[in-house]
Structures are given as C-alpha cells and as structure tokens.
Design a protein with these regions (language model features):
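RNA pseudouridine synthases
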Residues: 1-138
Length: 138
C-alpha cells in the first residue's frame, strides 16, 4: 500500500531527511475512544516508511492558503490510525494531516487529505497479483 497525505504545515528545515522509516508504539486511549496514544511499553509497533515529496500551497474550502507538506507513506504494519499518528504525534512528524479531526484541527469544509494511491493484493480466486493505482486529486 502507498498513501499520499498533505501535512498541515511545514517541517523544520534543520536536520530534516527526505525519506526514512519510523517505528512508533501506540495503544487505544480507553478514556477517549477511538483516540490512540503513545505507549512505548504497552503499545503495538507501527512501522511506516515515508518520503517528503515537497512543500506547496493548499487553498482550503474557506479560501485560505496554507503551507503544507506532501508526504508519501508506505505502512509496513496496519495499525489503527497509523498514518495519522505518524503525522501528528510528537514522536513522528508532529504535524497533523490537513482535515484530521482526531489528532489535529479541521477548518470548516476541510476533509482528511489522506489518499490510498496504490493497493496491491493477491486475487482470492485466480491467485493473480493485482495492483490498483489512483493518484490523489489534491
């Protein structure tokens, strides 16, 4: 799987890499479902490969121009809210995805700008490897 996301801001320029892999540990926040929280001791491992594709301007539905960071995510695990946490949590990028109502802020009319760009799987009947690709419209 590959995902494209727009992060609601720009990463600090110092020591920023263009790509890498992060491992974060999260568990359900039982007092604030469905929110997930960092827990290095009891959390489940979430491994995500990422690449910064660039910084650009995004015009939201209110007409406000925002500086955003376009990121490619390739999750190696399938944890709940894995990519949203890789973006928003301070152990990840520390910048939420545009429109994320759980881990960031959402301005009127915004939607979550996270898109599955590529999904591959083995067909259950033919056994053929299938790959579906669709570029993000944002």
């Amino acid at each position: 799987k590959e995902y494209i996301a727009l992060l609601d801001g720009v990463l600090p320029r110092k020591n920023i890499q263009k790509h890498g892999t992060m491992e974060l540990f999260f568990r359900l926040d039982v007092d604030n479902r469905p929110h997930q929280i960092w827990d290095e001791k009891n959390g489940k491992s979430a491994i995500t490969e990422w690449e910064i594709l660039g910084v650009e301007k995004y015009k939201n539905p209110q007409g406000t121009l925002k500086n955003v960071t376009r990121v490619l995510f390739k999750p190696h695990t399938g944890r709940t809210h894995q990519l949203r946490l890789a973006s928003a949590d301070s152990h990840g990028f520390g910048i939420p995805i545009v429109g994320d109502t759980l881990y960031g802020k959402c301005e009127a009319g915004e939607r979550l700008l996270l898109h599955a760009r590529k999904v591959s799987f083995v067909h259950p009947v033919t056994g053929e490897r299938m790959s579906i690709e669709c570029e993000a419209e944002f």
